Curated annotation (Swiss-Prot):
Alphabetical list of Pfam families matching this protein: SmpB (PF01668)
Main location: cytoplasm
Name of the featured protein: SsrA-binding protein
Keyword RNA-binding: yes
Gene Ontology BP terms: trans-translation
Amino acid sequence: MAKGGNKKATAAARAAANRLLADNRLARHQYEILDTLETGIELVGTEVKSIRAGQANLRDGFCLIRKGELQLHNVHISPHSHAGSYFNHDPLRTRKLLAHRREIDKLRGQLDRKGLTLIPLNLHLKGSWIKLTIGLGKGRKLHDKRQEEKRKQADREVKSALARY
């Protein structure tokens, strides 16, 4: 007997295995993202449960390179609701990010340029692993944000005009 299985079920399983857990939409507005990198993140058990429940906030987060390690700061992961206070984690603790040495060295070289920063963009599942996508961003000024908004509005108008014809 063949073990083909249901193709719809396998596609659904793949989609569930690669789902978005938290997104930092404000970062894409405040920064021009020049480069992205997918990293692992060192978590404790209650943090994993909270992230899978969708209780992570990346909005105020940033990354630093200290002692040759990537560190994630100021990301709030709510304490797990079913764990006691003794076993729970600190919501704002510094978390270590897992990346290859050459990737960290490349980021360090780029960060030495003026005005660049590392910001968390999203948390997602890749198989059973929780991954963090970080971005190398350059802060936008107010006039840059306005120009970007005007460009997006013009693109929307062109798209709607083409759809009408």
